[in-house]
Amino acid sequence: IVSSQYQEKDHQCNTYMKLLDEDNDYIWNLDCDEIFKSRDIETIMEVLEEFKITSVGFRSRSFYGGFDNVLGGFEEGAEFMRIRKVYPGSYWATHRPPTIAHTIPIHERLPERHLDHNTLDEKLGVRMYHYSYVFPQQVKQKVSYYKAAVSKQNCIDDYFENVYLPWVTGSQSTRSRIEEEYDGVHEFKPSVRGSCRTKPFEEEHPEIILQNMDKLKKKFEDQLNEFRTH
């Protein structure tokens, strides 16, 4: 599903790269459902400055079917590349995986130094809060896009109807049955991704989510009711 004036994400991302100021040091690329805690943003900024990091990857707390459960397994173990050092003329070589290329000579750049997701999580306790499988409309659109244009044969057929919606609306026994059948609930086939089961979220949401939780939960219920009536 591709809409608007952009052919794909590479085209879209390189359009905004042209608008960066020459003195910009980093690009922190996020989707609209990716949130960070304020204190974690400050920590990252301090680390970038002190250690001259050129790229940062994050572990994700990926929420599923609401705000109380997250995905474990392969999703929790994956590294989400989100911060890259940029220079005048830098551009996206590709968005999958997120890769920035540079036009200035290599001797004018910082030595490559990556802060990986495991170190960031284990040493500094920083993760990305990813509300990627929360709202029914969001999930249906996301999976349709991946099935049509990105992952294609790697996606479970009729995922929204057979996995997500029955899991969200089902009893605990229904949820357990679904997770047993698919070794989790991620839209990729188990043979591709490995195990990816849900587990309770036992931490605190970022501030902006807490401030808007009532509205977000209402949005979730309103969307869910739309599918219940279909």
PLM regions: where:
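Active-site-proximal specificity loops/subdomain of glycosyltransferases
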Residues: 1-25
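Catalytic-site signature of metal-activated, phosphate-bearing donor transferases
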Residues: 7-14, 35-230
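Short beta-strand-to-loop acidic/aromatic patch adjacent to the donor-nucleotide binding site
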Residues: 23-37
